[in-house]
Design a protein with these regions (language model features):
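Short solvent-exposed loop/turn micro-motifs enriched in small/polar/acidic residues
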Residues: 3, 78-80, 124-127
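C-terminal trimerization/auto-chaperone modules of long, extracellular attachment fibers and adhesins
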Residues: 1-11, 17, 21
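Extracellular disulfide-bonded cysteine-rich modules/repeats
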Residues: 50-52, 123-136
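Beta-strand-rich interaction surfaces with strong enrichment in secreted/lumenal proteins
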Residues: 72-74, 117-122
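Short, well-ordered helical secondary-structure segments
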Residues: 3, 40, 52, 119-121
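Short Gly/Pro-enriched turn/cap motifs at secondary-structure boundaries
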Residues: 86, 122-123
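Intrinsically disordered, low-complexity linear regions
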Residues: 6-9, 127, 146
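Exposed extracellular interaction/assembly regions and N-terminal maturation sites
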Residues: 15, 19-112, 136-148
Length: 148
């Protein structure tokens, strides 16, 4: 296979069109630009689109995700789009709980196994990082589950 170099914006002709939030290093790791939510709030689509939300709150915090319509538009989502969201509460002093909004649906795993993959609460301290996966069933609706 020939080596190819690209510069500037690149759009695929085979179906994937979207913005990359973060930097992809040569090792395949992704570095996100974190956004902070330190009080109970509804996250904006732009905040979620960064892929990495931090909380350093001393009080319990609830973060409600944006609607499927707003988030789908921000991500350029279509049916089959999969997006990972990390919540980092390692510097927080209390829990962070995630909630979904209109057109956000908890997966069966999230609804049935709340003690593991369905756990929508992120502890504070050293173990306080959660990874959540959003799988879009259309441009305006997503299924949400904890995956780590």
């Amino acid at each position: 296979m020939a080596s190819t170099t690209f510069s500037g914006p690149v759009t695929s002709t085979n179906g994937f069109i979207g913005a990359l939030t973060g930097n992809i290093a040569g090792t395949g790791s992704i570095t996100h630009t974190a956004t902070a939510i330190n009080a109970t709030a509804t996250a904006t689509a732009a905040q979620v689109a960064t892929g990495y939300i931090t909380s350093t709150s001393a009080a319990a915090t609830a973060i409600t995700l944006p609607t499927g319509t707003l988030l789908g538009a921000a991500l350029g989502a279509t049916q089959g789009t999969v997006f990972d969201l990390y919540i980092d509460n390692t510097a927080g002093a209390s829990t962070v709980t995630i909630a979904v909004a209109v057109n956000g649906i908890l997966s069966t795993a999230a609804a049935d196994t709340a003690g593991s993959f369905g756990d929508l609460t992120i502890a504070s301290g050293a173990t306080g990082i959660g990874r959540f996966t959003l799988m879009f069933s259309s441009a305006t609706a997503y299924v949400f589950t904890r995956t780590a």
